[in-house]
């Protein structure tokens, strides 16, 4: 893979994460406020960004030849995506209950770890 292609994946990945987190939070609070239709539209856009994250992340994983640290980051990112999806889906259905606290803890923990690994603060 050429460095130019890697740069495209990297910039798309990094910028899309910021947009994804903002859209996720807006969608969540719209759903909590009872504005279901607007929340559902944003939820669909969030799902599109999930796909973008997975494709660009896989491209970068290939570039780095499946280094262990980036495999760990990928697994954490998938858990993060799962937590975001469960928070949005179960909140909109009204079935989140006591599990909301657990999903928020998983969301925040994975988000911090993925960001720290992504910006090379954590490395091994």
Swiss-Prot record:
The keyword Transmembrane applies. It holds the Pfam family DUF1516. The keyword Transmembrane helix applies. GO terms for cellular component: plasma membrane. InterPro entries: UPF0344. Signal peptide: none annotated. It is a multi-pass membrane protein. The chain crosses the membrane at residues 15-35, 40-60, 61-81, 102-122. It comes from the Bacteria. Its main location: membrane. Keywords: Cell membrane, Membrane, Transmembrane, Transmembrane helix. It is found in: Cell membrane. HAMAP family: UPF0344. Belongs to the UPF0344 family. This is UPF0344 protein BH2983. It comes from Halalkalibacterium halodurans (strain ATCC BAA-125 / DSM 18197 / FERM 7344 / JCM 9153 / C-125) (Bacillus halodurans).
